[in-house]
């Protein structure tokens, strides 16, 4: 699972998910990509589950690029704790995803293999996604 080695601040505000992705929304490395259609927080565990699914299905020959990184800490308070006494401690990490963001890219495999691998990975995601192809053929 991915998480930052060190951050400037341990805790962050939750923020809001507004607008569409202006960066990371074109296929840059591979030939096929999985693109988000909804805004969401995707956890490091979900990213890892998708990565495992794609690498298992693509086998050898395929190269995978993960275009998102979980850099936002999500804090949680211990169970049955009274209100007050500050913000909880960081529990897990998420990546903030806006519509249009490329999540995974895959190259070096056939279209059928890429479609099947991305479909399996899409089932691991908490959002609607679609398969996109690079225009440089």
UniProtKB/Swiss-Prot annotation:
Transmembrane segments: none annotated. PROSITE patterns: RIBOSOMAL_L16_1 (PS00586), RIBOSOMAL_L16_2 (PS00701). Pfam families: Ribosomal_L16. InterPro entries: Ribosomal_uL16, Ribosomal_uL16_bact-type, Ribosomal_uL16_CS, Ribosomal_uL16_dom, Ribosomal_uL16_sf. GO terms for cellular component: chloroplast; mitochondrial large ribosomal subunit. It comes from the Eukaryota. Keywords: Chloroplast, Plastid, Ribonucleoprotein, Ribosomal protein. One of its GO terms (biological process) is mitochondrial translation. The keyword Zinc does not apply. It is found in: Plastid, Chloroplast. GO terms for molecular function: rRNA binding; structural constituent of ribosome. Belongs to the universal ribosomal protein uL16 family. Part of the 50S ribosomal subunit. NCBIfam families: rplP_bact. This is Large ribosomal subunit protein uL16c. It comes from Adiantum capillus-veneris (Maidenhair fern). The lineage of its organism: Eukaryota, Viridiplantae, Streptophyta, Embryophyta, Tracheophyta. The gene is rpl16.
